[in-house]
UniProtKB/Swiss-Prot annotation:
Reactions catalysed: 4-(hydroxymethyl)benzenesulfonate + NAD(+) = 4-formylbenzenesulfonate + NADH + H(+)
Xref: InterPro entries: Ald_DH/histidinol_DH (IPR016161), Ald_DH_C (IPR016163), Ald_DH_CS_CYS (IPR016160), Ald_DH_N (IPR016162), Aldehyde_DH_dom (IPR015590), Aldehyde_DH_Superfamily (IPR050740)
Gene label: tsaD1
Stated name of the protein: 4-(hydroxymethyl)benzenesulfonate dehydrogenase TsaD1
Top EC class of this enzyme: oxidoreductase
SUPFAM superfamilies linked to this entry: ALDH-like (SSF53720)
Binding site for NAD(+): 154-155, 178-181, 230-231, 253, 380
Subunit relationships: Homodimer.
Amino acid sequence: MSTVLYRCPELLIGGEWRPGRHEQRLVVRNPATGEPLDELRLASADDLQLALQTTQQAFEHWRQVPAHERCARLERGVARLRENTERIAHLLTLEQGKTLAEARMECAMAADLIKWYAEEARRVYGRVIPARLPNSRMEVFKFPVGPVAAFSPWNFPLVLSARKLGGAIAAGCSIVLKAAEETPASVAAMVDCLNQELPPGVVQLLYGVPAEVSQALIASPVVRKVTFTGSVPVGRHLAELSARHLKRITLELGGHAPVIVCGDADIARTVNLMVQHKFRNAGQACLAPTRFFVDRRIYGDFVDAFGATQALRVGAGMAAETQMGPVASARRQAAVQDLIARSVAAGARPVASAVPEAGYFVAPTLLADVPLDAPVMSEEPFGPVACAVPFDSLDQAIAQANHNPYGLAGYLFTDSAKAILAVSERLEVGSLAVNGMGVSVPEAPFGGVKDSGYGSESGTEGMEAFLDTKFMHYVA
């Protein structure tokens, strides 16, 4: 049981925490029990306009702050974040459901992301182009794009907010973050660590009615850049809204990651890695391995080994023995259970275990012998569900893996150089891990293709997303 007192946060506007003035309030619940934790007060139209006004004012100052000072301020904020890891992790587990170990890891990952961006602030370089005329110079400059509107989800609220906060602030932008209403306290605690080291208004945090917030922020001439992580339908809507107002947008959307397991793969090692990765955060990860295409020669052994997921200890995230917590909400629980039922009706064979009755729990489930037209092969589960299909040739596996609108992450297990070359060139994903799990690190770009979005976060590409380019030709 956590000893951390849970309270829903206020809004951060202009460097001050203030209550939201919207007439509507939302109840935040503990996914492990379904019981209410507190009520969240939302941003009103006046709150949104005040946030826009103050973010514009803050940007005019922050853009002129030298990169070395921006770096130092962010690094001090990161130090505060690390000092508060235990408290923030407890808040995250209470409101989101993931295990305490996973919550601690997420805090560490968020700190690493912001620190990397802080260091990158000192490495934003322009360039000199050889001039065409005597007594002249041609130069290219990089400068901050302007105030940013950022939208982050509930599944990894710290990490996915940190990707946006770190890049925008390091680049010299101010940022208005609309974080997920399901997980408000943990993000507010992280943002507070940064805010204490920044000038007022550089970072602002809002919670509100999503349609009202997105319309107000994206339509405003103050906002110059939009960044969103979330579902494909919402991403499409925000892309249309951004296009209408000619705003640059980065979209990191859904995933349905394929895993190709070749005949020479080490089954025990592959299953051990993939079970850890698949059922982390109860499978609520856009890069979670989900569709397993397994060489027919080892398919039976693979399914038997994967069936050991029934031994995973499912329970409340605060319990030390828990290996997988609940899904985040009753709505998510119902959606995952419905997808399993429809896929079983289509011919899939379920391998699952029992789970606690109270709370929003879904059993870690493997669907074996899945028909290619079963719903789970095309719909993102976003829960603790994996599906397995045998293949007879690598060409067949690649074709089946690509037969899906998503293209975020993919995985390959083999020692064959020929197979690695073929999959790396032909698998339609933004990130590929070979014989491992690492597809998301601060120093490398992360983003998808097809319906998984466009643009990158993290890496130098993620920093570029918050920068504009100016060319100057000077003749003496």
